[in-house]
């Protein structure tokens, strides 16, 4: 079982960070902000419909991402949830049009992780400082949004448990990827919030005075859920210091686009 890795690539101007090994037959990628059609302050590959960008621009950007990943023809099956900074995990088990319509209605009511065990159904979640997590194994994948609320609620571990329950795989077999997010050294939080994280995960989450490492908390949640340490890989990119390549809510003053975490399987 090969260890996961994240490698940069580019297709028609769209920069992707993914695993060319396609673990379990899963195509996965974290997107950046370049290669799209959106105008400032959403320039240019904004994937979020909730930020004030032109809907047509977002639709074209999403098409470009799937095309760059080799799945443009799957655009009509794309599932994008309404992220609410919670810990709800939803599962997609049926890719028929009626079932997908029902799934879209379900995730529109709010969820922050989706497990998918059917082929040809891409899942996309959107980010701008919060941590993105993709899990992949034979038979399925999960994409999760892990901001501080989701992280302290162990959403990555919950998604791992749900994925394994659906696929019958062991947690240690799952490839785990943490995408670009605000790194601990850049993430200043209140003393109270830091204390809450230390109580939940231990001192490893402290990245400095009033600095919180979401990565270490996510790693702990995954390990506690049974993940193999060698199967967890981090992008090593902080959105706060890579604003030319990724969107950062904090650095932009709250007005910006959203990059994405995307995954799908093939028949």
Regions found by a protein language model. Name each.
Residues 1-267:
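Active-site microenvironment for binding and transforming phosphate-containing groups
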């Amino acid at each position: 079982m090969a260890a996961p890795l994240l490698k940069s690539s580019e297709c028609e101007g769209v920069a992707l960070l993914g695993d060319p090994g396609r673990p379990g037959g899963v195509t996965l990628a974290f997107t950046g902000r370049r290669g799209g059609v959106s105008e400032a302050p959403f320039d240019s590959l904004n994937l979020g419909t909730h930020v004030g960008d032109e809907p047509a621009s977002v639709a074209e950007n999403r098409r470009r991402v799937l095309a760059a990943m080799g799945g443009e023809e799957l655009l009509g099956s794309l599932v994008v949830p309404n992220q609410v900074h919670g810990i709800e995990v939803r599962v997609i088990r049926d890719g028929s049009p009626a079932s997908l319509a029902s799934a879209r209605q379900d995730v529109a009511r709010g969820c922050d992780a989706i497990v998918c065990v059917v082929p040809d159904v891409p899942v996309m979640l959107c980010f701008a400082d919060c941590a993105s997590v993709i899990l992949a194994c034979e038979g399925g994948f999960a994409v999760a949004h892990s901001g501080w609320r989701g992280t302290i609620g162990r959403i990555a571990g919950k998604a791992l448990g749900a994925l394994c329950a659906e696929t019958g795989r062991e947690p240690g077999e799952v490839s785990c990827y943490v995408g670009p997010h605000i790194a601990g050294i850049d993430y200043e939080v209140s003393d109270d919030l830091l204390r809450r994280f230390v109580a939940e995960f231990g001192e490893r989450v402290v990245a400095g005075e009033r600095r919180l490492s979401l990565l270490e908390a996510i790693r702990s949640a995954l390990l506690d859920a049974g993940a193999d340490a060698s199967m967890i890989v981090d992008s090593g990119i902080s959105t706060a210091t890579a604003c030319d390549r990724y969107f950062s809510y904090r650095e932009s003053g709250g007005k910006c686009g959203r990059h994405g975490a995307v995954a799908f399987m093939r028949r």
